[in-house]
Amino acid sequence: MTTVITRKYRISRRLGVNLWGRAKDPVNKRKYPPGQHGILGFKKLSDFGKQFAAHKKFKFYYAISSKQLRRTFLDAYNRKGYTADNFIGILESRLSSVLYHSGLVPTIYSAKQLISHKHVTVNDKVVNISSYRVKPGDIIKIRERAAKIPVVVEAEQKQERKAPDYLEADSKEHSVKYLRSPQYSEVPYSADMEVNLVVEFYSR
């Protein structure tokens, strides 16, 4: 897990934002990219550069590939309503996103790991696919045998993050109920994700 956290710190510094809101993230003090020439600071970005950077924020925040992110956008674009709201709604309905934002695990990476190791159920059925889309009313739960895994115990003891209004979490039962699809303003991002720039990036 230490390796994962270190990698996350490098990502945050490369993007110039504290992407996951960690208090110890070096980007809080060092506002420049990592590496030998990082101290020179960030280059001024073109409009495309800004759009590309916004796309990378979402890619790293949700720990998904560029291909997955593009598929998500196309799905959002083809739905009725505002593309940006649809985009956020789909990302937040991913099983890994729900588990992470519930506060039952400390990171998106630990959420994905628990899911892939079959430690998570949806409506009492084991689901081992992080991209599985939950529906309003679904109950996600960490299996009893996984309740003593260090990352789960850590999250329960620290309770650093409160579940947003569209989730109903129960730390004692290690469960969370997905109530509804959220809007961008409701998602507890610790940085400005600039979703409109992502829409522009994929709409070129």
Curated annotation (Swiss-Prot):
Disulfide bonds: none annotated. GO terms for biological process: ribosomal small subunit biogenesis; translation. Signal peptide: none annotated. Keywords: Ribonucleoprotein, Ribosomal protein, RNA-binding, rRNA-binding. One of its GO terms (cellular component) is small ribosomal subunit. Residues 93-156 form the S4 RNA-binding domain. GO terms for molecular function: rRNA binding; structural constituent of ribosome. It holds the Pfam family Ribosomal_S4. The keyword RNA-binding applies. NCBIfam families: PRK05327.1, rpsD_bact. Part of the 30S ribosomal subunit. Contacts protein S5. The interaction surface between S4 and S5 is involved in control of translational fidelity. One of the primary rRNA binding proteins, it binds directly to 16S rRNA where it nucleates assembly of the body of the 30S subunit. Belongs to the universal ribosomal protein uS4 family. This is Small ribosomal subunit protein uS4. The lineage of its organism: Bacteria, Pseudomonadati, Pseudomonadota, Alphaproteobacteria, Rickettsiales.
